[in-house]
């Protein structure tokens, strides 16, 4: 959990990152190493060394692929734009970031200590995130006006989206 003092306003940003996942099990390699199908395969997948039908040790790394990365999710809101935020959310599969105002209202955004949609998109681009959803829109925007925020964000980060309350967003594994 990231909590940083930015311009005398406490800002909460959260990053949740899964641990790496085991590599994929290769049944063909297990058969070639004379490990019979069944409970021994499960033990190998759990990281245990097993004996094959010849009484030889077979190690998990002999039948498991490379570790696979977990997913990373970041959430940033109620803050002024700071380029350093990008480092905190770097490589996220999903960034949920406030985009309270359109570019024309940047002075008002600074005064109220919020970001524009373009500033949120700049963070997403600089952090090399996979996907970004905007949140925390100013109440001045009706549903018909929100696409303007999206358009400004997508000019910088094409994978920007608008999010809504109670919206479910899937974060798929990369592999």
What annotation goes with each model-predicted range?
Residues 81-175:
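Binuclear metal-ion centers of metallo-dependent hydrolases, dominated by the metallo-beta-lactamase
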Residues 1-75, 79-88, 94-96:
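Active-site-proximal loop/helix segment associated with metal-binding centers of metalloenzymes
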């Amino acid at each position: 959990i990231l909590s940083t003092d930015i311009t005398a306003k406490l800002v909460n940003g959260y990053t949740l990152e899964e641990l790496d996942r085991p590599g994929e099990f290769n049944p063909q390699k297990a058969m070639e190493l004379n490990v019979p199908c069944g409970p021994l395969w499960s033990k190998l997948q759990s990281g245990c060394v097993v004996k094959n039908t010849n009484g030889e040790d077979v190690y998990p790394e002999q039948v498991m692929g490379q570790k696979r990365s977990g997913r990373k999710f970041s959430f940033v809101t109620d803050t002024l734009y700071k380029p350093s935020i990008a480092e905190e959310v770097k490589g996220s599969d999903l960034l949920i970031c406030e985009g309270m105002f359109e570019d024309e209202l940047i002075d008002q955004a600074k005064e109220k200590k919020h970001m524009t949609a373009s500033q949120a998109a700049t963070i997403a681009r600089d952090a090399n995130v996979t996907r970004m959803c905007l949140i925390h829109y100013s109440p001045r925007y009706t549903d018909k006006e929100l696409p303007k925020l999206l358009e400004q964000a997508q000019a910088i980060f094409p994978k920007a989206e608008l999010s809504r309350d109670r919206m479910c967003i899937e974060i798929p594994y990369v592999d």
